[in-house]
Amino acid sequence: MDKKSRVLIVGGTGFIGKRIVKASLALGHPTYVLFRPEALSYIDKVQMLISFKQLGAKLLEASLDDHQGLVDVVKQVDVVISAVSGGLVRHHILDQLKLVEAIKEAGNIKRFLPSEFGMDPDVVEDPLEPGNITFIDKRKVRRAIEAATIPYTYVSSNMFAGFFAGSLAQLQDAPRMMPARDKVLIYGDGNVKGVYVDEDDAGIYIVKSIDDPRTLNKTVYIRPPMNILSQKEVVEIWERLSGLSLEKIYVSEDQLLNMKDKSYVEKMARCHLYHFFIKGDLYNFEIGPNATEGTKLYPEVKYTTMDSYMERYL
């Protein structure tokens, strides 16, 4: 059996980071979790780190501002996976440029996976402001990786089900992370196809890609065939499972893009909803020669369908 790569996860206490840590351990990789000194001020993060340690992970403390400390950490592993936050509130994508410099100096990393895990920033054309900052920053990190000739894999895991299926995409202004029981906003005509992925499944696909020569210097799109669904189809799944009949309130493109008097976070959310549910930027393109698809690479992974996923909300 081939020796498993030693994996360092940066941002391992975050929403997707903790799934990557658990997937790495489950798949038998020697797993290292980098945590920043400030994480020790938060009891929930400390308890999560301890739980990783109890599962077999090695904890490493370092600041992204400590270049030599980062280099010393990177030299202990073979693969680096970054899961730093690129969210609407905490946006730290450009912090990864410090990680790129450390990896470049260390010179031993076989694969680097930057924090992506959503829409492919190189595919989305003319992203709306202010939501375009996510794509601009991710592109900067990609170009820095490529300029440094660091071996990479970019993973596009599309829409995390907890955010977009469980909420029925009710994220316009006042996010609701549980499925509605009375009425639901439908963006556009509700028929634009998107791709929904269980977060734990995403962690498995991400980790499986790190030692695979087929994913070297390529983008991996995770497109579970049964989870390529429109917003209306997800709503219909919930109605069928729950026995409810929801009132559908249709939100036009113009209404969605009316940013007047909206906060920065609300504007960011509306931009992403536009790209997902109006333009269809998750699924409106063919996978090219410099990319591949995760469920085809790893058919042994039994992914979670949205029918199954939504049962937890009953």
Swiss-Prot record:
It catalyses: (-)-lariciresinol + NADP(+) = (-)-pinoresinol + NADPH + H(+); (+)-secoisolariciresinol + NADP(+) = (-)-lariciresinol + NADPH + H(+). Transmembrane segments: none annotated. The active site is at K138. Keywords: NADP, Oxidoreductase. InterPro entries: NAD(P)-bd_dom_sf, NmrA-like, NmrA-type/Isoflavone_red_sf, PCBER-like. GO terms for molecular function: lariciresinol reductase activity; pinoresinol reductase activity. GO terms for biological process: lignan biosynthetic process. Its EC number is 1.23.1.4, 1.23.1.3. It comes from the Eukaryota. Substrate binds at H272. SUPFAM superfamilies: NAD(P)-binding Rossmann-fold domains. NADP(+) binds at G11, G12, T13, G14, F15, I16, G17, R36, K45, R142. Belongs to the NmrA-type oxidoreductase family. Isoflavone reductase subfamily. Reductase involved in lignan biosynthesis. Catalyzes the enantioselective sequential conversion of (-)-pinoresinol into (-)-lariciresinol and of (-)-lariciresinol into (+)-secoisolariciresinol. Abstracts the 4R-hydride from the NADPH cofactor during catalysis. This is Bifunctional pinoresinol-lariciresinol reductase 3. It comes from Thuja plicata (Western red-cedar).
